[in-house]
Amino acid sequence: MKEEVKGIPVRVALRCRPLVPKEISEGCQMCLSFVPGETQVVVGTDKSFTYDFVFDPCTEQEEVFNKAVAPLIKGIFKGYNATVLAYGQTGSGKTYSMGGAYTAEQENEPTVGIIPRVIQLLFKEIDKKSDFEFTLKVSYLEIYNEEILDLLCPSREKAQINIREDPKEGIKIVGLTEKTVLVALDTVSCLEQGNNSRTVASTAMNSQSSRSHAIFTISIEQRKKSDKNCSFRSKLHLVDLAGSERQKKTKAEGDRLKEGININRGLLCLGNVISALGDDKKGSFVPYRDSKLTRLLQDSLGGNSHTLMIACVSPADSNLEETLSTLRYADRARKIKNKPIVNIDPHTAELNHLKQQVQQLQVLLLQAHGGTLPGSINAEPSENLQSLMEKNQSLVEENEKLSRCLSKAAGQTAQMLERIILTEQVNEKLNAKLEELRQHVACKLDLQKLVETLEDQELKENVEIICNLQQLITQLSDETVACTAAAIDTAVEEEAQVETSPETSRSSDAFTTQHALHQAQMSKEVVELNNALALKEALVRKMTQNDNQLQPIQFQYQDNIKNLELEVINLQKEKEELVRELQTAKKNVNQAKLSEHRHKLLQELEGQIADLKKKLNEQSKLLKLKESTERTVSKLNQEIWMMKNQRVQLMRQMKEDAEKFRQWKQKKDKEVIQLKERDRKRQYELLKLERNFQKQSSVLRRKTEEAAAANKRLKDALQKQREVTDKRKETQSHGKEGIAARVRNWLGNEIEVMVSTEEAKRHLNDLLEDRKILAQDVVQLKEKKESRENPPPKLRKCTFSLSEVHGQVLESEDCITKQIESLETEMELRSAQIADLQQKLLDAESEDRPKQCWENIATILEAKCALKYLIGELVSSKIHVTKLENSLRQSKASCADMQKMLFEEQNHFSEIETELQAELVRMEQQHQEKVLYLVSQLQESQMAEKQLEKSASEKEQQLVSTLQCQDEELEKMREVCEQNQQLLQENEIIKQKLILLQVASRQKHLPNDTLLSPDSSFEYIPPKPKPSRVKEKFLEQSMDIEDLKYCSEHSVNEHEDGDGDGDSDEGDDEEWKPTKLVKVSRKNIQGCSCKGWCGNKQCGCRKQKSDCGVDCSCDPTKCRNRQQGKDSLGTVEQTQDSEGSFKLEDPTEVTPGLSFFNPVCATPNSKILKEMCDMEQVLSKKTAPAPSPFDLPESKHGATEYQQNKPPGKKKKRALASNTSFFSGCSPIEEEAH
């Protein structure tokens, strides 16, 4: 009897998974926020939902199980049904939470799901309840394309599985496999078997997407050991639903599309059931029969069960719509009321009911008689919890130990796989050789017998030779078998070493991981095939052995059967004879005793016949059994052959996969080698990325503006809707006037809101796509930056050095960093716009809006007005669409024309480009010809320069020869000058003598006008003789060619300026004349005391070769040894008279060290200046030769100073002598007549 309890709501747990790498790479943001310490989640900014449990992305599996699922297990042992239901979008973590992909290797991992944890907790509780007997059965089914498939059926064929409803037991599934389990390991193996058989495929949103709804059911029956009539039955349904999906996001095609349609259909029916159960306003009808999923979950939703719904959601803002839908369905599920009851056995329930009636009657009876009710009626014996806990602990330890042993044995089995196969092959070869050896041995025995019987000696010798050869063959066979076994052991050891050696390098590629998993799966299949093959071979071997043993028995039985049949025939004949004799004996009374004897004999014969027939039947049965055994053996041999073929195919496939993996590895190595070429193109790619980024920026800017406009329109539409709502409330208060206008305004606003909402959705999708593209660009740029920071090893071994690579990285790293920052800024902007639009859509699409949409139309008149307005809008929109289609066709036609024109222009441009290419080639040819011509001209100019240099050298040689001639002439002129000086000295001596004689005789005086005539054109004063013994005590000064040119130019200017410029010229001469250091003697300190004009050596100052100064007592007006305004330094004055001639003063007044022919006393003529200019041009290219010993002292000294002060590389100049006489530029000297 079922005991009803008060209805309890379905408990809902919300679980949010973290962002997956794909969503992070697309730049998705969290659209859910969790309130700490509260079971509340907020969508967007202000839309919140509250559930029984809320688990954020950081929550572990153990916490989810302990808080939400573990309390349901305690109710199972009280007789209540329980259901755990995982609901949500595809890829939201339902299978992960439920443990639908559990394997034995994940036993102690923290990521184990709910189903394995439920199994462990169930058996722990069972171990604690030692006073109960438990019977557990498990079943596993899936609903694939609206068909129920049994996951525990080994054949995986479509069995006849039907759904039936029992009034007492609820929903039952007829034809479903139920396996009895005793320990947790058996239950886990059933779960793993079902998981391996479940339909899983890959989509664009989930690489391991469940394509079916799966239900794992554990049925528990418990009985008290002390009271067999007290029993409870309960069921635990663990449901892993397939996720709802959109074809646009999953990109499903073919079978995947069909599966997705059926999944969405079943979930739609489930949503309708949840809505019907959660809405109190609707009728009592719930559409359970719309799908098989809702039919199977009929007891879990609104029936006899404690139900927990785990709503799994994705936090990415790109899945906000699906997440919001899941949250709304979960919120509706909280309103569902279940009525769980304790499931008791019907007979036990009836018995308990009768006991309750008896107790009630006893209570009434005692109350009637004034008695009391004993208080120990409902007392129950206590349980020994301590012993149960100790037993549970020991079982847990034993379970862990067995698990470790199992894992170790599995590893050893995997390593011995190849050895087993090779050993079997060698075993087969050895068996074949063993048969051959047995034949050889039999032949050998026959030969030995033949040798014994033979008498001919030659035949005996031949037979002995054959025997020796047989022995040799046997020895060689044994050696071959030993070598083969050794080779097999060596190969297996090498393979084991290779398998057990640690991996030196791990590839992060998914292909490598997939290859390893595939190899492991195939190895597992081979192990299973080997196990099955070994069992069947052992069975065949045993049956063959039994057949071989039964073979002689069969022949014996056949003989016995024949003999028995003959005996039966004989005995039948004897029996017939005895029957006839008995019939005759009955007629004869005297033969009564004989007839009794015969009658006994007849009975004995009948007994023998019956025994023989019984033996005959038994032997016939044995023969039939042998025939069936032979058929079984042949069938097993065929299966063994097929399994061996399958194993060979698996091994071949494993080798092919290994070869493919090796080829893939080689391909990857080639790609690594090609990194050098790719690195050279990165600069171009960077420029291309910059251009694309600019284009994308412009496009994204435009889309941002469009999204902002759509957002504004949506906001305006919502504002208008609020205003219309307010106006409608006001008009309702005033009356029912203007119904048509009100309905028209309301429908217009609704349509505008819907259109704005759809536009906002479209812009939202565009923004999501834009952010995805931006995120991909950021990932690519970051990968490029990392690859530039860490160049591959192959690249470091290239021709260019690592420093050059680092330089290239530094050049483009700043640009890449700036691009990444700008893209991240754009992503943040897109995320803010997405969040804003999503919030607006959440406000516009409230949960109650579909209900409130048509509440404004309450009468037929309002409905007619609405239909009339909608029909009018439809007609106008159709007309507008027709106009747009016409304009579109025209635009397409014009576009086609433009494309045609564009094609023609492109052809024209291609022709022009061809012509320009030809022109470019022609211009290139002309350029090359000009270059060749210029090269030839350059060669000719080089030849001409060489010739000019040759002619210049020849001219230089001529000038050098001319200089030598001039040097020779100067030497001759020097000799003439010396002779002239000697003559002048003699003349001076004679004049002095003459003057002395005149003074002495006082007969003749020198005429003053002769000596002091200022108007004389030229007055000659004989030079003072220069004795060769006198040592020069004055510093020599030289004059270079530049000073000589300056003096000549200055003297020419004096000719042009006239006599009035003499003072200034005199001052200029003092500037360039070097200062002479004069050694003043003691005799000349007081000056001279001449009375005349100080014109001869009688003057002390002139004798000391110095000028008269202030200390002299001579008359300054008469003294000719004075210079006005000058120091006492000897100079050579240069004056010019009215006729343009020069006057040379007494050479004795010249500073010591200067010769008589110092060029400062005369101005060179124009011919000398011309020759000097020509020589200067020549000397600018060639260094002047060493000065001759006949050069003037001043010239030598000036050249020395110039050479010390000239810059490096400047050629030294020298003074050139004229080809004419030295005095060609001077006026002739007139001698004084005595």
Curated annotation (Swiss-Prot):
There is a cross-link at K1196 (Glycyl lysine isopeptide (Lys-Gly) (interchain with G-Cter in SUMO2)). Iron-sulfur (Fe-S) cluster binding motor protein that has a role in chromosome segregation during mitosis. Translocates PRC1 to the plus ends of interdigitating spindle microtubules during the metaphase to anaphase transition, an essential step for the formation of an organized central spindle midzone and midbody and for successful cytokinesis. May play a role in mitotic chromosomal positioning and bipolar spindle stabilization. Its cofactor is [2Fe-2S] cluster; [4Fe-4S] cluster. Belongs to the TRAFAC class myosin-kinesin ATPase superfamily. Kinesin family. Chromokinesin subfamily. It comes from Homo sapiens. Keywords: ATP-binding, Coiled coil, Cytoplasm, Cytoskeleton, DNA-binding, Iron, Iron-sulfur, Isopeptide bond, Metal-binding, Microtubule, Motor protein, Nucleotide-binding, Nucleus, Phosphoprotein, Ubl conjugation. This is Chromosome-associated kinesin KIF4B. Residues 1056-1071 have a biased composition (Acidic residues). Residues 494-513, 712-737, 1007-1030, 1052-1076, 1122-1143, 1183-1234 are annotated as: Disordered. Residues 1086-1144 are annotated as: CRD. ATP binds at G88, Q89, T90, G91, S92, G93, K94, T95. Residues 713-737 have a biased composition (Basic and acidic residues). Residues 498-513 have a biased composition (Polar residues). Residues 663-1234 are annotated as: Interaction with PRC1. Signal peptide: none annotated. GO terms for cellular component: cytosol; microtubule; microtubule associated complex; nuclear matrix. PANTHER family: CHROMOSOME-ASSOCIATED KINESIN KIF4A-RELATED. Residues 1000-1234 are annotated as: Globular. GO terms for molecular function: ATP binding; DNA binding; iron-sulfur cluster binding; metal ion binding; microtubule binding; microtubule motor activity. A motif (Nuclear localization signal) lies at residues 793-798. GO terms for biological process: microtubule-based movement; mitotic cytokinesis; mitotic spindle midzone assembly; mitotic spindle organization; spindle elongation.
